[in-house]
């Protein structure tokens, strides 16, 4: 079942440096996600990235690889689903690197990451040279669904500094101010 998912990342401009260009062209890429089907979603976003010619930054929705599956019948089903999506993490990074290199843009999106038995809603920011940075969502809306991250991510791209947030983290600006 495909569902239209609306949550977007908001990137706040923190400061401009002397080398900053006049503007940054940002593509906010939205899609009808195939819930839990990482392969189908990656194929779909591959097509969508091709239409982002001339963009400096390409931003995908929260959990763009799988959708945000909040209504599982039981905990076991939810864990099984997260394990499946988290197993794609290396492929997601590889695909985002390809998109960043091909487009020359900074590519930003989040997916599920698993480490030491804990799940994180991880935002990845991938540069055209293949390097990437990340932060894990700090304020998780539903307790127990994801483990909270403990660091903030500010990026500089094309001479402009950005601060990254995933959805609900915007409701807690003091966390950002303190980091």
How would you name each of these model-derived features?
Residues 27-36, 75-84, 159-161:
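Short, basic, glycine/proline-bearing loop/turn elements
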Residues 47-128:
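Cys-nucleophile CN-hydrolase/nitrilase-fold catalytic domain and related Cys-dependent amidase chemistry
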Residues 30-48:
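N-terminal phosphate-binding loop and adjacent alpha-helix
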Residues 114-179:
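Active-site catalytic loop in hydrolytic enzyme cores
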